C-alpha cells in the first residue's frame, strides 16, 4: 500500500512538472470584483507573482466580474516571457472625484517583453466626469517600452482622454478592438502611436470625439487596415512640429478603411515653426460617407483653427511623397480635397489617383471641389479648384511609391511568436493549490499510469 501511495505521489509530481503553468486569477489574491471595492492591490500582487515566475505567465481577469481599479502601473521586466493577460471581465476607473494618484494615465504597462492582452473583456474609463475639466486628464491605457506587444478583442469605453497610447514600442499588433466614446467628448482619441516602429492596427471599430487613430512623431513602418471610423476626426498623421519640435514620420500605409460622418478622413496636420518630415505615406482604398474634410493636408494647424494661424514662420515640417488613391464616397462640404502648405516649405510629390468624391448635399453626383496652396505633385483626375497638381495619366511614380510604402509597412512581423495560452482541458484543485492540464496526451498518459499502479 505504501508503495502504491509513493507511486501516486510521484505520478502527481511528474504531472505537475509537465503541465503546471504560471496562470493566476486575480481573485486568488483577494480581488472582490463587485465594481465598488478597490481591487488595485490584489491586481498588483497577482502581477508581481506572474511577472516573477518562470515560463509563460498568465494573468487572468475572470468573466462575470467587475473590478474597480485606481491608477496602476504594471512594471517589467518580467522573468516570465511572454506574459499573457486574459481579459474576460470588466475594469472600471473611479470617477474624477474619487480618483487617487497619477493623472497622466489610469493603467500603465511598462518595460515588458512579449506582452499579450486578449479577451472579450471591457475597459471603462468612466470619462464623463472628466470631460468638462480644463486641466490634465488621464489616458485610459498606456504602453511604454513594450516590445512584441499584442492587444486584441477588448472593448474600450469612455476614456477621460485618449483610450490607448503606444509609446517607445517596437513590433506591436492591435486588432479587433471596439472603442467607443460620445462624439462630443473632447480629445478622446481611439489609438495614439508615438516614438514607435513596426506597428500593425487592423480590423477595429472606433467611434470617438477626436482622432480615431493618430500617428505622432518618431514613428515608422505603420500599417493600418480594416478600420471603421466614425464619429470622430478620422485617421491623422500628427499633429507634428508643435513648439518647434523636430518631427519624423515615415512609411505609413492606411488601407481599406471606412469613414462615416467624421470631421476628417485622411489628414496630415503640422504646426508652423516645427521641422523634420512626414514622408512615404499612403492612403488607399478609402470609403467616405458624409465626411466633412475627406482629404486634408494642413501645415498651418493651430490646435484646430488653421484659418486663424497668424504665426506663420519660416520653418515647417516637410510633407512629401504622399499618395491618396482609390477614394470613393461623399463629402459633407463642397471641398473633397484641401491642401494648405507653407510657402517656405511647400508640400512636394503629392499624388491623387482613382478617386470619386461627390458632395453629399447635392444629391446629383456633383464632384466635390478642391483647394490648394503651395503644393507640387500630380493627379489622374481633374478636381475643380485643384490646379496646383499637374494633370497626368502617367502615374508610374505614384504607383511605385504606393507599392513601396505599403510593402514596407506590411512586412512588419513580430520577432518572437507569442501565441495565446489555451484554456486548460482539466483542472485539479486541493488545499489551495491548482493543477492545470493543457495537453490531452499528457492527461491520457497520466490516467493510464495511475490505473496501472492501482491495478497492481
Curated annotation (Swiss-Prot):
RNA-binding found in the keyword field: no
Primary localization class, coarse: secreted
Stored SUPFAM superfamilies: Pectin lyase-like
Disulfide bonds: none
Domain of life: Eukaryota
PbH1 repeats: 169-195, 196-217, 219-239, 249-270, 278-299, 314-341
Signal peptide extent: 1-23
Active site as annotated: 210 (proton donor), 233
A Pfam family reported for this protein in Swiss-Prot or TrEMBL: Glyco_hydro_28
EC number(s) recorded for this UniProt protein: 3.2.1.15
Subcellular location: Secreted, Cell wall
InterPro entries from the UniProt entry: Glyco_hydro_28 (IPR000743), PbH1 (IPR006626), Pectin_lyas_fold (IPR012334), Pectin_lyase_fold/virulence (IPR011050)
A cellular-component GO term for this protein: extracellular region
Molecular function, one GO term: polygalacturonase activity
Keywords: Cell wall, Cell wall biogenesis/degradation, Glycosidase, Hydrolase, Repeat, Secreted, Signal
Catalysed reaction equations from the record: (1,4-alpha-D-galacturonosyl)n+m + H2O = (1,4-alpha-D-galacturonosyl)n + (1,4-alpha-D-galacturonosyl)m
Gene Ontology biological process terms in this record: carbohydrate metabolic process; cell wall organization
Assigned protein family: Belongs to the glycosyl hydrolase 28 family.
Protein name according to UniProt: Probable polygalacturonase At3g15720
Organism listed in the record: Arabidopsis thaliana
